[in-house]
Amino acid sequence: MWGGGDPARFGIAGGGRFPFSFPHMMDRLPGFRDFYPEPLPLPDMWSADARQYIFGKWRAVARRYGFREYDGPPLEPLELYTLKSGDEIVGQLYNFTDKGGREIALRPEMTPTLARMVAAHERHYKKPVKWFAIPQLFRYERQQKGRLREHFQLNADIFGEADPAADAELVALLIDVLRSFGLTADDFVIRLSSRNAWQDYFNQRCPDAGKAYAFYQIIDKLEREDPAASREKLAQLGFNLDEITAFIQAGEPTVELRGILDNLAARGLRDYVKVDYQVIRGLAYYTGVVFEAFDKKGEFRAIAGGGRYDNLVKLISGGKVNLPALGFGFGDVVLLELLKVRGLLPTFDAAIDAYCLIEDESLRPASLQLVQHLREAGLAVEYPLVAAKPDKQFKRAQEMKAAHTVKWEPAPAGGEPLVRVRNLRTKQEQSLPAAAVAPALATPAT
């Protein structure tokens, strides 16, 4: 439906029928999702109720940690992404030239938008700035398990604090978000690493800084790529896979990592983390501690990931603002699949508080007034939009899992009209004045 406008613009004279028809059933684009309300017709469909459940948990835990919610536009200048990642990222984006001749893209990630926003107005906010968002992100890439061409994501970031205590705070937030869904230390682990340690390793063996990004990309894919292919790529850069494997296995924590581990241990969260230099994060802008969350059974790709990006604000602001920063992203696709497999998604009940029966159409105006009164009292109430037989109305009330039915009773001679309230679970019935109905519906049956 269009939100307004003249139907004649679309060749629909006088609001009539469309002068054309589609030759086939329209479907969504590959890699995109439709979200349906429960109950779902098919088990492989995406649940709007599950999505809202996840959003609710994300928001609740982030707010407990003192994070404030923000948002930004889904379209950004293409340069915002090529500035930090180079032109090669364009192949992964949904980008186009708009009618004003601007090169723009659907956002593939939220961090550059946030860095732009903070750089523009950071002087108005006391540090550290702790913000979160739940954006929808888009990437034109090959679909695979746990990865589509769009997803929603919890982004949580801290600006203006360079101390590792901020890194520990962010990791603790991620742990508690995962725990809020019923996941335990038996289900997931946060793997901590350090880009500083890897940078030292690289600099000691290669004088060509221009090869660093390619090196990090290879390390980031070691677990997913054939060892022979990784060995060859590393050799081309002057590195030896066996030496790198030994460095990873040694796993000696840096000073910053030890500080984070001690901080988390003081919170009772040490069992959820381990140092693992296999994690390096492929994005070019990471500068310090990096981390990823994995399910311990190894059934899924990384659940979440993030780290420090102390130079990004300076880069995006053209050198005008320099703020240390760190953050993580936590997508909904892998999380939903993980919760399904672990049996941790709740049953989403679409039950309503009451269904208003209208068995006498002369009572419809009074019934509508009752419905409105109950809804304004915060109750979920439905009623038949058009005249229907009483048995059909009652069946509809049961289908909607109504806790009660309500209906006006004929007023006795000289008496006050009453509302008949029936509890469909206990089968108890009572007749009440209209003003007493809302409190009665809100009171649990004993």
What are these regions (language model features)?
Residues 22-272, 277-285, 290-302, 311-318, ...:
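Extended, charged alpha-beta segments that form solvent-exposed binding/catalytic grooves
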Residues 10, 18-22:
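Aromatic (phenylalanine/tyrosine) cluster motif
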Residues 22-25, 256, 260-263, 267-275, ...:
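NTP/phosphate- and nucleic-acid-binding module
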